[in-house]
């Protein structure tokens, strides 16, 4: 009996030695991506103001533990709050009105234990993308893109992430913004895998969406929710407002990725059981795997 017990013990040790490296390799090849319009801080939101929901929102980010997170509509004070609460993360990006602190950020947060930022930058969605605060086409607001090249520390694999927020009024601006992003992705990322997160203010029927996912582009992006197949979770909408009586219908927040990745899952996280809501948008989460 003692020999049988010893045999079982060493058999378990042998199995663990064989399985652990594979599990570690699988974990290092996967990236958890999150995109969230956190709603700007404004007194007009009354009981749904940032000061009443910031702790719950940051706690949700910590709970979900994304490797990279693209946020939209963050004002400078909101960036400071998130940096303070998200201890394991660093952030990249500048405000859209002056390239410093004025206006909204479309910032990127990243898990500093898993990811190393190699290079990063900003461009504006306009005819003069390198001029801070420039406004493009028929847009109602200045719009910005934050990008960064990351190296996943365990695997050594690189990718480039772009995060943005398209204009809510200018239809030409949304179309031209999509064209510009594809062009910039090609020049910035080259042959590296690409991830694009953002609130695009369009549905999948809009021309801007079709431009981003056009299969003949220099950088071919795919909607990770479309590719997730059976691993889709959550509702088919992302804009929910703050009124529990509001009936949401629009899916306008996305995570796109090049075909360098397998899409393991896509989840639109429905938090509407919480009052006040964390934001007026639901976050999108995708798990991607390097091929």
Where are the regions that the model predicts?
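N-terminal, active-site-proximal structural segment of metallo-dependent hydrolase catalytic domains
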Residues: 2-4, 21-85, 98-104, 291
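Bacterial N-terminal signal peptides
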Residues: 10-18
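Active-site beta-strand/loop signature of hydrolases that rely on acidic residues for catalysis
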Residues: 31-38, 57-82, 109, 148, ...
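Solvent-exposed loop/turn segments at secondary-structure junctions
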Residues: 38-41, 75-78, 96-100, 114-115, ...
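Short, solvent-exposed loop/turn elements at domain surfaces
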Residues: 40-47, 71, 118, 171, ...
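Structured beta-strand-rich core segments of catalytic domains in phosphoester-bond hydrolases
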Residues: 68-158
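Metal-dependent phosphoester-hydrolase catalytic domains
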Residues: 114, 172, 176, 183-194, ...
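Metal-dependent phosphoester/phosphodiester hydrolase catalytic core
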Residues: 140-144, 151-175, 187-188
């Amino acid at each position: 009996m003692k020999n049988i017990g010893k045999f079982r013990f060493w058999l378990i040790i042998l199995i663990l030695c064989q399985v652990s490296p594979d599990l570690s390799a699988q974990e290092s090849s996967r990236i958890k991506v999150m995109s969230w319009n956190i709603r700007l801080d404004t007194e007009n939101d009354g009981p749904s103001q940032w000061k009443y929901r910031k702790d719950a929102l940051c706690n949700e980010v910590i709970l979900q533990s994304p490797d990279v997170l693209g946020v939209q509509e963050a004002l400078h004070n909101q960036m400071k709050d998130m940096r303070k609460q998200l201890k394991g993360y660093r952030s990249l990006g500048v405000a859209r009105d002056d390239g410093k602190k004025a206006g909204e950020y479309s910032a990127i947060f990243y898990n500093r234990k898993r990811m190393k930022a190699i290079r990063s930058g900003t461009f504006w969605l306009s005819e003069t993308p390198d001029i801070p605060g420039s406004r493009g086409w028929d847009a109602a607001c200045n719009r910005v893109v934050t990008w960064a090249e990351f190296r996943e520390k365990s695997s050594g694999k690189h990718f480039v992430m772009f995060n943005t927020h398209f204009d809510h009024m200018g239809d030409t601006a949304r179309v031209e913004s999509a064209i510009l992003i594809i062009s910039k992705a090609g020049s910035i990322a080259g042959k590296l895998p690409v991830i694009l997160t953002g609130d695009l203010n369009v549905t999948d029927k809009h021309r801007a969406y079709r431009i981003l996912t056009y299969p003949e582009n220099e950088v071919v992006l795919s909607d990770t929710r479309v590719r997730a197949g059976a691993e889709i979770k959550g509702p088919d909408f992302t804009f929910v407002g703050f009124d529990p009586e509001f009936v949401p219908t629009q899916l306008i927040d996305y995570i796109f990725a090049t075909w360098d990745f397998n899409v393991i899952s896509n989840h639109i996280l429905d938090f509407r059981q919480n009052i006040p809501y964390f934001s007026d948008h639901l976050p999108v989460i995708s798990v991607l795997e390097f091929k």
